[in-house]
Regions:
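Bacterial N-terminal signal peptides
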Residues: 11-21
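Sec/Tat signal peptide C-region and signal peptidase I cleavage site
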Residues: 22-26
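Acidic, serine/threonine-rich low-complexity disordered tracts
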Residues: 27-127, 168-269
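Hydrophobic, well-structured mid-protein blocks that either form specific transmembrane helices
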Residues: 121-162
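Bacterial N-terminal signal peptides that target proteins for export
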Residues: 2-12
Length: 269
């Protein structure tokens, strides 16, 4: 990832990264947070000259399917700005990922139209000798493909970490606690961490208030760690992101929950 000025869809997903373990690897784990059929939707907002405007929407869904002959979770994320926001910054993104029933990543693809850029990212995972081998591919706006092979444990794309990390329990965390991991896309595998900031109540766009965990996401793109976003996730077994605040070059942005359905547990936050 190269800039904080794009990938709003990623911000929806990093809201779950706080649950990842420092020592996480490709070893499978039991899913305790979601079930097939879960669907989440959000309103996107931009702050333009101190005025918040409705900028578009995003949605995330998870289903059980088949991938190369085995049962797998398929997760899909779409994000789209509306006509008004398109005047400032266009987003038309579709992301898809597959992971095993015990949450080991298999394949990831991201088709993005952000501003004037059109990229296609792919990540293929293979595990051998206790190591995670990743084949990265990015096709840029000019149509040229760029390839890279990376071997690095504790690495996940945004969708696979969203699914995997929701089953971790942060109940023992204290203010300032940090969790480290690596984030991979079609070009880079960057170190990142989440810093815990306590609990607070947050309003959704569905006339409901939620008790949430406050978290800040930092990523190192080669020039030191920078804070990308602050976000709030339900303080219950579902660990669903409710609100995400993001600073962009042209102003601020946020995503607020609109609809939650197919959740594994009743919302108790």
């Amino acid at each position: 990832m190269n800039s904080r000025t794009h990938k709003l869809e990623n911000v929806l997903l990093v809201a779950m990264l706080f649950l990842a373990s420092v020592g996480a690897s490709a070893q499978g784990m039991t899913n305790t947070a979601f079930k097939s059929g879960e669907y989440l939707s959000y309103n996107l907002y931009f702050n333009w000259k101190f005025v918040w405007i409705k900028a578009g929407n995003a949605s995330f869904s998870t289903t059980m399917t088949r991938y190369k002959g085995q049962n797998a979770y398929k997760s899909s994320l779409t994000a789209k700005t509306n006509a008004r926001a398109d005047k400032f910054y266009v987003i038309r993104d579709i992301l898809t990922a597959y992971c095993t029933g015990n949450l080991v990543p298999l394949f990831y693809t991201k088709n993005t139209h952000e501003g004037n850029r059109r990229n296609l990212d792919e990540v293929t995972y293979q595990f051998s000798g206790g190591k995670c081998h990743m084949k990265l591919r990015r096709r840029k706006t000019d149509g040229v493909n760029h390839y890279k092979n990376v071997v690095r444990n504790n690495s996940f794309d945004m969708l696979s970490i969203f699914l995997r990390a929701r089953s971790w329990n942060p109940s023992g965390w204290r203010n300032g606690y940090k969790v480290g991991f690596n984030i991979v896309d079609g070009k880079n595998c960057n170190p990142a961490y989440i810093q815990y900031g306590g609990k607070t109540n947050v309003d959704g766009d569905n006339n409901r208030k939620y008790r949430c965990l406050k978290l800040s996401y930092y990523e190192n793109e080669g020039k030191g760690y920078k804070r990308i976003a602050t976000f709030y996730v339900t303080d219950d077994q579902n660990h669903i992101p409710i609100l995400i605040d993001l600073n962009l070059k042209f102003g601020s942005a946020k995503a607020k929950i609109v609809n939650i359905r197919g959740n594994r547990y009743p919302i108790r936050a």
